[in-house]
């Protein structure tokens, strides 16, 4: 939490696993789901999709994950990835601040 509580700065929120993050090694890490996919997706939602409100970016990220992978395949770890990927912060805040 040092990056969140840094004096004269710090983060406004944090996204991450509450448990062990699952992933696919190698080039498939961006296509196979798991921690790498969902972590990259939050940045895609912000940068490419323009979701600059934290809660909206988080919602769209999880929604896109759930619609992209088979949530009934428990062995693949997709359900666990979504359940363990937590957002800590105020969902109403705007990324980059307000003008």
Where are these regions (language model features)?
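Active-site-proximal C-terminal subdomain of hydrolase catalytic domains
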Residues: 1-99
């Amino acid at each position: 939490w040092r990056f969140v509580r840094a004096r004269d700065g710090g983060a406004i929120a944090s996204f991450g696993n509450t448990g062990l993050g699952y992933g696919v090694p190698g080039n498939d890490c961006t296509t196979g789901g798991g921690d790498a996919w969902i972590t990259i997706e939050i940045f895609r939602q912000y940068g490419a999709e323009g979701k600059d409100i934290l809660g909206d970016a988080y919602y769209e990220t999880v929604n896109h994950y759930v619609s992209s992978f088979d949530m009934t395949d428990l062995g693949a770890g997709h359900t666990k990835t979504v359940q363990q990927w937590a957002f800590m912060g105020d969902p109403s805040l705007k990324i980059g601040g307000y003008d």
